[in-house]
Amino acid sequence: MSLAWKNELLKLLKENVDSSGVIHPEYFQLATLPTGNEIYPRNRTVAIRGFVGTGWHKPRPDDVLATDLLVFSTDIASHKAAEIAEQQKNTFPSGPIPNAFEMCGWLPKTMQQIRISGQIWLYTPELADRNEFPADKLIQDHLINSNGRIPEEWSWEEERRRIWELHSPELRASFSTPPSYSKYQGDVKVSPLPSTLTGKEDPGVIEAWKTAWGRFSLVVCEANEVEFLNLTPPPGKRVLHNRDLNTKQWSSTRVNV
């Protein structure tokens, strides 16, 4: 497996970190295909949490697992989750890929654009139990330095827990609020939620925590094409990274801007 595009992405995001907190290079615009009776593609901004197993750091010897799968969280009560789940259900077992995605990010400090395309997957324990999420195959196809074996101490539930703990108490609480686009019936009081329960919390916090954890899911982005466009200095530089869907091997090509 080639790590060229992953290493380049990690380098660029590090170069674009803003100590003031104004610039968040991990925010990307994500576009997916329409479902059902919808006409238009859907687009939204998401906060990528790094790569499955390692987050935003380069693979280290003590990592349980390392991949080139990008991951972020979403609420299973959201339209986004329902759309992705419907598309991936129609993807199995083979054929067209209705769960296609493209994401795009702009890095203002270095004047660079990143585009990533491929297949998008929603993970919940229920989807995995119904074989509507390719749990093992997805990892086996994207493992880095693990000889094709999934470590026994790693699981998708452990990954969900890891991402959950990365969220702030306030952001965790947002998963217990009324679903997006539901009828507005006044502001809802939100209390920050801990990463785990001790049993000493107020009943209201415990109930909110259970709701939030139950609605907390992962979105996994399986990249097949990655494009880096550097606009400075002119005339710029555009590099394409493509993954062969049969051999799973990556190739890189520089093309004109």
From Swiss-Prot:
A Gene Ontology biological process term: pyridoxal phosphate biosynthetic process from pyridoxamine
Pfam families: Pyridox_oxase_2
Domain of life: Eukaryota
One GO MF term attached to the UniProt entry: pyridoxamine phosphate oxidase activity
GO CC annotation: cytosol; nucleus
InterPro entries noted in UniProt: Pyridox_Oxase_Alr4036_FMN-bd (IPR024624), Split_barrel_FMN-bd (IPR012349)
Family: To yeast YGR017w.
Protein name: Uncharacterized protein C725.03
Originating species: Schizosaccharomyces pombe (strain 972 / ATCC 24843)
